[in-house]
Amino acid sequence: MRLEQPRNSLKRSTLDLIERVNRDEYPSLPQDSKCKDALVSAFRKTANFKKYNRPDVNSREQLISPSLTEEDLLGRIRQRYKEKIFAGGQEKFADQSFIAEQIASTYEDFKDNPTLPAYCGEMTYLLYYHLREEGIKPENMLVVGFSANAEDHVLLMYSSDEGFLEQIKNDYFEQEEEGEEAESYKNFIELCARRDKNQTLLLLDPWSQDNKILDLNQLDRDESTNEVIEDYFKNKREALEEGFQPHAIIDGVLEESRVSKATGSVINMETLSFQVDAFKPEELMEIDEENTSDSSEEGTSKNRFRDTLFSNVPDSSSDSENEQEREKKELAGKTPSFRLC
C-alpha cells in the first residue's frame, strides 16, 4: 500500500506563502534579501512533508483514515531518530544545530518515500536545518515551544539581531532563577515588544496552513505588538480545537517534573536541550538497537530517559502527587506557557 500523497492544502499554502514573499508582502524581507531567499528555498523543501500527530493523540485525521503503512513508517523514523539522538549524547545539553542535523539525517534515510509524517517539532527543526543550509546562522534562530493545557506547539523565531535572541534566553532564565512562574504568552510577548524596530523579527511556523510567517514589522502604527501576537495565537488555538492538536515530538522533554524538576516548565537549552545530569555520557553511548527497542528492560535510567523523551505517558518514577497537581492546573485552564526548546 502506498502512502497517500501530501495534503494539497499544505502544498498550496506553501506555494501561496512563496508568492507572498516574492510580492514583498512581508515588509522586513526586502531589506533582508538573504533571509528572503533562504525562506523561499527552505519552505519549499518542507512542502512535501505530511502533517502528523503523535500516536498517543487521537487526532481527527487518525480516527478517519488510519494507515498501518504510515504507522509502520512512523515507527521506523522514531526508532532511527532515537538511535541518532542517544548516539550523540556526549554533552550536557544538546544544541539546536545538532538536533536539526539528526532529524534531517533521519529523514534523508527515508527520502525515497514521497510523503513522510512529521510532527510540528520535526517540521520546525527541518525548516531550521534548511535555513542553515541556505546560509542563515544559528545565532539568528531560536526554536521555542508553547503549551496550552496538554497541547504543545513548536515554532521558530528568526531575528537579524543575534543579541536579541540571546537576551530572550538570558532574561527568561533569569526570571526562572528568581523563582517566578513561567508566564503563558505574556512573557514572550513582552520580550518581543522590546525589540529594535529596525531589526527583522519573524515567527516561522511551517506546520501552520495560513500563518507560516508572522512579520512583527508588519504591524500598523496603531497596533501594539502585544495585541497582534495575542490575536495570532488566540485564533490559532481556536483552529486547533476544531482540527489538529499538534504536539511536538519533544513534548516529553518539555513537560515539567519529568526530566528536570528544578526549572519548572522550562529546561535550559540552546533550543531542544535536554538535561542529562542523571545520565552518564557513556550510558547514553551504550544504547543500541537492542536496548532502544520496545522490548528493552524497563526501570533503567536509560529507558526512563528514553520514555521521557518520546512518550506522553508520565514517568513512573516521577512524583505522582506533583504530576496530578500539574495536570489539575492545566485542565483548569492554566495559562499556556512559553518555553525555549
Curated annotation (Swiss-Prot):
| Source domain of life | Bacteria
Keywords for the protein's UniProt record, in alphabetical order: Cytoplasm, Plasmid
| Cell compartments where the protein resides | Cytoplasm
Question: Which cellular component terms (GO) are annotated to the entry?
Answer: cytoplasm
**Principal location:** cytoplasm
For the region Disordered, give the residue spans. 287-341
> Where is there biased composition of kind Basic and acidic residues?
323-332
Where are the compositionally biased (Acidic residues) regions?
A: 287-297
This protein's record includes keyword Ligase: no
Q: What this chain does, per the record? A: May be involved in the pathogenesis of acute Q fever.
Name of the protein described by the UniProt record: Protein CbhE
Organism field: Coxiella burnetii (strain RSA 493 / Nine Mile phase I)
